Amino acid sequence: MEYANENCNGHASQDICVKGHDQQLDPLNWNMAADALKGSHLDEVKRMVKEFRKPVVRLGGETLTVAQVAAIASQSGTDVTVQLSEASRAGVKASSDWVLQGMINGTDSYGVTTGFGATSHRRTKEGAALQKELIRFLNAGIFGNGTESSHTLPHSATRAAMLVRINTLLQGYSGIRFEILEAITKLLNNNITPCLPLRGTITASGDLVPLSYIAGLLTGRPNSKATGPNGELLDAVKAFQRAGIDTGFFELQPKEGLALVNGTAVGSGLASMVLFDANILAVLSEVLSAIFAEVMQGKPEFTDYLTHKLKHHPGQIEAAAIMEHILDGSSYVKEAKIVHEMDPLQKPKQDRYALRTSPQWLGPQIEVIRAATKMIEREINSVNDNPLIDVSRNKALHGGNFQGTPIGVSMDNTRLALASIGKLMFAQFSELVNDYYNNGLPSNLTGGRNPSLDYGFKGAEIAMASYCSELQFLANPVTNHVQSAEQHNQDVNSLGLISSRKTAEAVDILKLMSSTYLVALCQAIDLRHLEENLKATVKNSVSLVAKKVLTIGEKGELHHSRFCEKDMLKVVDREYIFAYADDACSATYPLMQKLRQVLVDRALLNVDGEKDSSTSIFQKIKAFEEELKVVLPKEIERARSDLEQGKPAIPNRIQECRSYPLYKFVREELKANYLTGEKVQSPGEEFDKVFTAMNEGKLVDPLLNCLKEWNGAPLPLC
């Protein structure tokens, strides 16, 4: 854009006064909004992660991102620092000077010479006293001292709010001194965090009540508190000392109190934190769905590009392409194809919906989360107080940018998307632990030798049901519960912070579900490894016993029963190993029953041979079973022991898969162990390791490593 110099003498850095032709290019900002969604969601998440890890956040008013807000919120000043654009100083000073000059000239201006809200008909010439009273009466929050539950806003959310508020005020439309913004920056960089109440805002004339506590600290109110870098409680004097603010407490000038409190920073700051996590969780859900397809021996056809191209939705197409990339060349997929070809009737022609329609299910959720992210990024770069000081036109504009509807709406939508992701995750988890549906894995993913004394993930499934139920409840909207407030002046209000808080809860619950599910998938991977080793052992044992017992007759001649071996090995191939592995030679379990049936069927065809004991196959059945009972249990135990000692005969297929980085991270870095009733560890201990790592951001790199080779496009149709 080109800036028109003749009318923009107060805001030379702003794009308000533009030549008519340029203004007509995108006067409604729709092109800007559309451009922000170009490129893949995964590339955007990668950019967010990169921004999150930068050591400096430079504020100029218009380029703040949700990742930068999340970085400042979650890290101390020693990890990442805030720098203010010096170029913003002139515009900030111009608006501040304009307010003071207006007082001198006797200009009547809302919140400067008038009362507030429904009482704006009142007038005063005591501008500084009015700001002081504004902060006092807005300090109406309750911190709940003496109760078990905290009523204090999490310090990370407060840090996010401080950053966003600085960014708004830097744009020079609010009538506040630059020195106040520098003081808030010093608080951030020295990890001094004001204590704000958790509740009490409707985010409609902004987040008045919580923001007033930041103003209270800046003005040295006796009730104001802050926490230091180590969580120690500080009064205002000590907070200023620790932050290195040596100018003393601020005596607010006209409009400055209103500038500090009349904005949406608390709701949009928390929303930024939520969306940073939500975007990563969306990618995680795609990868976990692909791993689910691997361990369930799913048919990869569900990811075919043509299917999704014909549906047109970009989120669905990308979700399918990511899953397709994970499954392309997967050793599990190759093995599953062999299994399906060997016995096409062993499982349904089509996989169940939780697997087969996962791209269609996740795609819209990704689109919603991405759109919400862009909406919040516009909000955190907006000027959202009232009135706005337009120095260039010498006027104060009385409007309603403090209305936080973009926050409430985007957070309600995000929460619904998170609930849908959680519902899919629970459906997949339920299939995974159910031996009626999981294609040969043990019930409850039991990892021990004795399923009667090992109930695996049964407790985890109950917990997952609990998490999912709460998550579905949280999906209910907040924004349809508006109450008229402040003498019916604030008769519609956004409830933005309330919705952000509920969405933060939803993110937390989805992390609980994701942690549990990831450990379950790792368990399933190890069980497939055990299954493969045990099946090879059983086949080898059956083959050895068959050769020993069935090949030679009583007189050393070749026996007709030798032809049974091939059919017996087919039985082993087709029978689920965990259906009998705990007592392989039990007559009540399917292996022995079906091996015997092979011999019986062959004997029935051996009519003449059965008349002679030396050629009778029936006569061989008992000898075969007795010999197998001697050999097989020992060999199964040996195979288990070898695997437990890290010496399996067959390596783990996961090492040949693109999903391996996540598995390796869980097993090797976090030391989250294979679960079995034979060990002391409880499932929750292992889930906690993953949950903690997820909250610390440690899961991001292994997650993205699973997709590092993806070129951003589906496989070509050929």
Swiss-Prot record:
<dbReference type="GO" id="GO:0045548">
    <property type="term" value="F:phenylalanine ammonia-lyase activity"/>
</dbReference>
<dbReference type="GO" id="GO:0006559">
    <property type="term" value="P:L-phenylalanine catabolic process"/>
</dbReference>
<dbReference type="GO" id="GO:0009800">
    <property type="term" value="P:cinnamic acid biosynthetic process"/>
</dbReference>
<dbReference type="InterPro" id="IPR024083">
    <property type="entry name" value="Fumarase/histidase_N"/>
</dbReference>
<feature type="binding site">
    <location>
        <position position="350"/>
    </location>
    <ligand>
        <name>(E)-cinnamate</name>
    </ligand>
</feature>
<dbReference type="InterPro" id="IPR001106">
    <property type="entry name" value="Aromatic_Lyase"/>
</dbReference>
<comment type="subunit">
    <text>Homotetramer.</text>
</comment>
<dbReference type="InterPro" id="IPR023144">
    <property type="entry name" value="Phe_NH3-lyase_shielding_dom_sf"/>
</dbReference>
<feature type="binding site">
    <location>
        <position position="486"/>
    </location>
    <ligand>
        <name>(E)-cinnamate</name>
    </ligand>
</feature>
<dbReference type="InterPro" id="IPR022313">
    <property type="entry name" value="Phe/His_NH3-lyase_AS"/>
</dbReference>
<feature type="cross-link" description="5-imidazolinone (Ala-Gly)">
    <location>
        <begin position="204"/>
        <end position="206"/>
    </location>
</feature>
<comment type="pathway">
    <text>Phenylpropanoid metabolism; trans-cinnamate biosynthesis; trans-cinnamate from L-phenylalanine: step 1/1.</text>
</comment>
<feature type="binding site">
    <location>
        <position position="356"/>
    </location>
    <ligand>
        <name>(E)-cinnamate</name>
    </ligand>
</feature>
<feature type="binding site">
    <location>
        <position position="386"/>
    </location>
    <ligand>
        <name>(E)-cinnamate</name>
    </ligand>
</feature>
<feature type="binding site">
    <location>
        <position position="262"/>
    </location>
    <ligand>
        <name>(E)-cinnamate</name>
    </ligand>
</feature>
<feature type="binding site">
    <location>
        <position position="458"/>
    </location>
    <ligand>
        <name>(E)-cinnamate</name>
    </ligand>
</feature>
<keyword id="KW-0587">Phenylpropanoid metabolism</keyword>
<keyword id="KW-0456">Lyase</keyword>
<comment type="function">
    <text>This is a key enzyme of plant metabolism catalyzing the first reaction in the biosynthesis from L-phenylalanine of a wide variety of natural products based on the phenylpropane skeleton.</text>
</comment>
<comment type="similarity">
    <text>Belongs to the PAL/histidase family.</text>
</comment>
<feature type="active site" description="Proton donor/acceptor">
    <location>
        <position position="110"/>
    </location>
</feature>
<feature type="modified residue" description="2,3-didehydroalanine (Ser)">
    <location>
        <position position="205"/>
    </location>
</feature>
<dbReference type="GO" id="GO:0007623">
    <property type="term" value="P:circadian rhythm"/>
</dbReference>
<dbReference type="Pfam" id="PF00221">
    <property type="entry name" value="Lyase_aromatic"/>
</dbReference>
<dbReference type="InterPro" id="IPR005922">
    <property type="entry name" value="Phe_NH3-lyase"/>
</dbReference>
<protein>
    <recommendedName>
        <fullName>Phenylalanine ammonia-lyase 1</fullName>
        <ecNumber>4.3.1.24</ecNumber>
    </recommendedName>
</protein>
<feature type="binding site">
    <location>
        <position position="489"/>
    </location>
    <ligand>
        <name>(E)-cinnamate</name>
    </ligand>
</feature>
<keyword id="KW-0963">Cytoplasm</keyword>
<dbReference type="InterPro" id="IPR008948">
    <property type="entry name" value="L-Aspartase-like"/>
</dbReference>
<dbReference type="GO" id="GO:0005737">
    <property type="term" value="C:cytoplasm"/>
</dbReference>
<keyword id="KW-0585">Phenylalanine catabolism</keyword>
